[in-house]
Amino acid sequence: MFLPSPNNLSGLNQNILEELLRDKRSPNTRRTYAKALKDFFLTMAGEEPSPDVIAWFLSLDHFQAIAMVLRYRAELLAKDLKPATINVRLAAIKSLVNYARRVGKCQYTLEDVEGLKAETYRDTTGVSPTSFKQITDHITPDSLKGKRDLAIMRLLWDNALRRAEVCGLNVGDYQPTERQLLIKGKGKLGKQAITLSAKGMALINQWLTAIGPRPKNEPLFCTLDRATFGHRLSGNAIYNLVRTSAESAGIHKVMSPHRVRHSAITAALEATNGDTRKVQKLSRHSNLNTLMIYDDNRHQHQAQITDILADLL
C-alpha cells in the first residue's frame, strides 16, 4: 500500500519523529523506536519516515489510522514474528501518535489497537556459581584490561547489574567510603545507591589504581585501545567481554551480560531458599511476579511433574 502525496502540511514545521525520540530517556528505546517506525512506514507507505509522510499519517481520520495499523499488525503476524517484537513495534507507533496529540499535530488515538499476549522472562537459565568462577578465573589480573574486566564481571555477578547500568557509571559514582555505587536503573530518572561487596570494591580499587587519577565525570570503565583510549565502554563491548570470556573458559552456553544477571538472581534465590522479597532488593525488579518465574524455573516444577506422569505408565 502506497500513500498519496501529502497535502496541507504548512502547519508542520518540525520533524515529529525526531522530537519523539529526543523525548525518550533511554538510548536503547530511541534506537528501538526508530527502527520500528522505519519498518512501519516502509511497509505501509513504501518509504522511510519523513516529516511529510509522518504528517500524512497523522492527518488520517480515526478509523483510517486504526485500519492501517491493524493491517500492519497482520503483516507482522504473517511474518511469524514473536509477540514481544510485534508489541514493541505497535508501542512505537502508539507513542508517535500520543506525542503528536500532545503537541496538537494529531486528532486520533490508537487505544483500540491491542497488543498480543506475550510470555515474558521465560528463559531465565544461566550458569552455576562454579561455572561463573571458571569464567573469571580465566581472566588474568596482570594487565590493565584484565583488571578492568574482572571488576566489570564482579559487578555483573555480585550486584546483578544490567550492561546499560555498567556503561553509564562514572568515576564519581563509586563511593568507597560508603561502600556504595550510584547506578541509573532501568526506567529510572535519577540514580540509586547500591551496596558493593568487599571483593567487588577490591577489584574496582585495583582497576582505578592501575588506570590512574581521572575526573569524576569520566566513565568508570573505559576503552583501552590506542584509537579510543578513555572513551565510555559501549553495551556491545560489555556483551563481547562476557561472551568471549565464557568461550575462553570452555563454557558451552552462549553467555551475555543479561545471562550473567539471570545466573546471579537464580543463585541468590538458591542461597536464600527462595526468599523473593530479599532477592528483589538485588534484582530491583518492580514486579515480584518476575522473580516468581525465576523461582519456578529454579525448581523445575514442570519437569518434575512430567517425570511423575511418565513413571505412572
From Swiss-Prot:
Superkingdom classification of source: Bacteria
GO BP, sorted A to Z: cell division; chromosome segregation; DNA recombination
Any one annotated GO CC term: cytoplasm
Molecular-function GO term, any one: site-specific recombinase activity
PROSITE patterns: CB, TYR_RECOMBINASE
Domain Core-binding (CB): 7-101
Protein family membership: Belongs to the 'phage' integrase family.
Name of the featured protein: Tyrosine recombinase slr0733
Protein's organism: Synechocystis sp. (strain ATCC 27184 / PCC 6803 / Kazusa)
